[in-house]
Amino acid sequence: MMKIITYNVNGLRAAVSKGLPEWLAQENPDILCLQETKLQPDQYPGEVFEALGYKSYLYSAQKKGYSGVAILTKREPDHVEYGMGMEAYDNEGRFIRADFGDLSVVSVYHPSGTSGDERQAFKMVWLEDYQKYVMELQKSRPNLILCGDYNICHEPIDIHDPVRNATNSGFLPEEREWMTRFLSAGYVDSFRTLCPEKQEYTWWSYRFNSRAKNKGWRIDYCMVSEPVRPLLKRAYILNEAVHSDHCPMALEIL
């Protein structure tokens, strides 16, 4: 069995100061996929995670204090691929892949469109490019686990107020349609597949006391390619972890 956790930490150094290593020692995943690390490699507190038995692979944005993804793993990967080979995205440190035998694990941070029209347009182009890239990758690496912050809620069950949020980035009709297309192209939302009726969230705004009121969004996913579906054992949201405005999601596979 393998346990994988995905977690948008909203600044890794801040999360470490809020007890992330102690929490990680308790949860003890085989692989931890991080998003929004917001640091450069020379700022990475590697010894903290090394002490817990993790090897670290980081892919940082060029801009300091922004974006960035990482994979921490107790198992030695056969290969690590940094980026997608597309400069506009790779400059922002959004995609890293580690291969373990015939299984590939990705940590991905999809763009947010909340800052305005320009970034929303960037996000929509990224979504098409991401799907094309993943589908091409799947020809050589069919067993994919695509973990990360997708910055999209798919269905009304995934968001606390679907009516009022229907005009907000993250729940726009065109974003939801993209996710429907992505899933129908041969990818599986592990949490929704294993927990069809659970209304749980992975992100809450820091404003309006949203987390205490559980006014949240489910935007963090462990997607898997169709060949991995039979291996799905358990998927669950760890909403007691409070190192970030997101909480982690765990996937256990056979």
Language model region names:
Residues 37-40, 45-113:
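Structured beta-strand-rich core segments of catalytic domains in phosphoester-bond hydrolases
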Residues 64-79, 198, 210-230:
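Conserved beta strand-loop-helix elements of the APE1-like EEP
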